A protein has these predicted regions:
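Short, surface-exposed loop or secondary-structure junction motifs
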Residues: 1-141
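Residue-level recognition of conserved structural "scaffold" positions that shape functional pockets
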Residues: 68-69, 129, 145, 149, ...
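Short, gly/Ser/Thr-rich active-site loops of penicillin-recognizing serine hydrolases
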Residues: 98-108, 131, 159-200
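Short, well-ordered beta-strand elements
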Residues: 135-136, 146-162
């Protein structure tokens, strides 16, 4: 917290359950259950208690942050806070280490424009319609988050949700299509596992 949150001005960020509870101002997690006997039907959203296990391993879903905090983090990882995250550190973090063929398949179900998935140190690298893209995403019970940026354009997006809706992951290709001037597809309207016609 002293090495990153404070110097980056991430005033609401913390890495423990106690700090989250003490803040009093945070979005409660929401879930919904699949209806019995239905493959595509779900019940209503309902609020649930937070799951304490996520804070036992801070690197695995144990950070609490507001959208303002995440905006500061996005500035840092895009090279605008070299006093905290020097360029050589970012280069090390973002250098691809392994190819991710399973990630290619998963992301193709979100948008076929995601290709060439690789894994760096905690970050995924893709080519989105040929444009370099760096991203990190994850979910825990009742929450989902995604941060992504186009390093050659110095533009990024942060998506935070107090649910694990699969539509959350479809916001990113919608944003990327707008930013890159690509033909628009209604990714949010697509069912899971389908791709829009003509978007190969």
């Amino acid at each position: 917290e002293m090495r990153l949150f404070a110097p980056l001005g991430m005033r609401n960020a913390s890495a423990d359950e106690e700090s989250l509870a003490a803040s009093g101002d945070w979005a409660r997690p929401h879930v919904r259950e699949r209806l019995k006997g239905e493959s595509d039907a779900y019940g209503p959203w309902r609020s649930v208690e937070i799951t304490p296990i996520y804070w036992r391993v801070p690197a695995a879903g144990g950070v609490n942050a507001s959208i303002s905090d995440m905006a500061q983090w996005l500035k840092a990882v895009t090279g605008h806070q070299p006093g905290v995250l020097p360029r050589e550190t970012l280069d090390l973090i973002f250098t691809p280490r392994v190819n991710s063929p399973a990630e290619n398949i998963r992301m193709r179900n979100v948008s076929p424009r995601f290709k060439a998935a690789q894994y760096a140190f905690g970050w995924r690298r893709y080519a989105y319609d040929g444009e370099p893209l760096i991203a990190h995403s994850g979910t825990v019970e009742g929450y989902g988050a995604q941060i992504a940026f186009l390093p050659e354009r110095d533009v990024g997006i942060i998506i935070l949700s107090n649910s694990r809706s699969k539509r959350l992951w479809r916001i990113l290709p919608t944003f990327l299509d707008i930013e890159l001037g690509l033909p628009r597809e209604d990714w949010l309207a697509l069912k899971e596992g389908t791709a829009a016609a003509g978007s190969k």
